[in-house]
Regions:
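Solvent-exposed, non-transmembrane regions of membrane-associated and secreted proteins
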Residues: 1-180
Length: 180
């Protein structure tokens, strides 16, 4: 009897997002991977929660031209909440993510991946929350496929070293990926 070869399963390879395109605004920015880190005050001292543990935050990129993707989560287009942040301004220079507060539901954007493929998204919602009162769903994982973009907004709070609000844009993949 002839042996039947069992096909090997194709290993899963996570697509790495490399560029975010705000297609209707003709603006693009590179994306770099970041992780979760301890929050620190302006002097570099750890900020502690009520139990004395360091407060954890998503890393950012020190540039107005580059977005940060939380690599511990899914890539945009995979099941779950792909989180990307960027600066509204950096060292008094307007950042690429300054467009977020002007976006509207239905507006399109695209993500290019390290393999050259592209996935298109449409804005589902645009919300502004205070830094002290933004909902947990912004950073939580989900069963649906979504990309959450985050940037600062509002007045600068020098005591906290950040703006007092956050703009949160949630985008979902377009059903028709043939749209350009």
């Amino acid at each position: 009897a002839a042996a039947v070869a069992t096909p090997s399963p194709t290993p899963y390879v996570k697509k790495i997002p490399v560029t975010l395109h705000f297609t209707e605004r003709e603006i693009s920015c590179p994306i770099e991977a970041v992780g979760i880190m301890d929050d620190v005050d302006k002097k570099g001292n750890p900020i502690l929660d009520e139990s004395g543990e360091p407060v954890k935050i998503m890393g950012t990129i020190d540039s107005e031209k580059v977005a940060a993707w939380l690599e511990d989560g899914p890539s945009p287009g995979e099941p779950g909440n792909a989180i990307i942040n960027g600066h509204i301004r950096w060292k008094k220079v307007a950042g690429v993510f300054s467009v977020l507060s002007d976006m509207a539901p239905g507006e399109k954007m695209a993500v290019t991946y390290d393999d050259g493929s592209v996935m298109y998204f449409a804005v589902a919602s645009v919300d502004v929350f205070t830094i002290d009162d933004w909902p947990a769903w912004v950073m939580e994982q989900s069963s649906d496929i979504r990309m959450t973009l985050i940037t600062c907004h509002g007045e600068w709070n020098s005591s906290q070293g950040t703006s007092n609000e956050r703009v949160i844009v949630v985008a979902k993949p377009l059903e028709d990926q043939g749209v350009s």
